[in-house]
Amino acid sequence: MLKFENVSYSYPGSDAALENINFEIKEGEQVGLIGANGAGKSTLMKAALGLITAQGNITACGLPMTQSNLPQIRRKLGFVLQNSDNQMFMPTVYEDMIFGPMNYGLSAEEAEQLTDETLALLGLSHLKHRHNHKMSGGEKRMAAIAVTLAMKPELMLMDEPSSSLDPKNRRILINTLKKLPVTKIIASHDLDMILEICDRVILVDCGKIAADGPAGEILRNKELLEAHSLELPFCLAGPVGV
């Protein structure tokens, strides 16, 4: 599904942002990508999307990450941005959702059917004709996920999907992501969400993989997390003294 082999990348005039990254994500896995600010998570996501040209070998959805393969690869990948305003650019949710499928050759009727099916799956049918500027932040985040799913991606990459959400909308987001069968990579500082959704965690620090394994093991390892400037998820931290 996604494989990195000895992948490295440096921004001009700076140290390595990624250094000898190796991992393989298989179909159906739910992977949390964690690390402190500046650890390399965003750069890794950019490499997975083909937005930067890294050294080493990247294979996505069975295709080598080459310039000639990028159009095919990007049709198989879905990316949910941290800021939904940068993703929702049409007047209504419906228009956003049919835009991609129709560009890929579906008829208006087929695109609308796909839109209706996707919104029903997510319990968001009430948002179909909602104007984007009249939605709350949580509604817009959920709509952005629906727009991405309407493209029928084989692999979804998500950047801080729970950021800035109130508790109610965060819970709706988590419940939605848990029931989506598509393979997912979720980059987030929300370790409680990662623990609840993901079965595997990749911990990145200083552009290197510091740990890669079962989410429950890594996120319960207080010494490991603190060594890489992270803390236990709140649900595992216990009572806080006053």
Feature annotation, model-predicted:
Residues 56-65, 73:
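Conserved ABC transporter NBD signature motif
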Residues 188-189:
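H-loop/switch region of ABC-family ATPase nucleotide-binding domains
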Residues 194-196:
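A short, surface-exposed alpha-helical micro-motif characterized by mixed small hydrophobic
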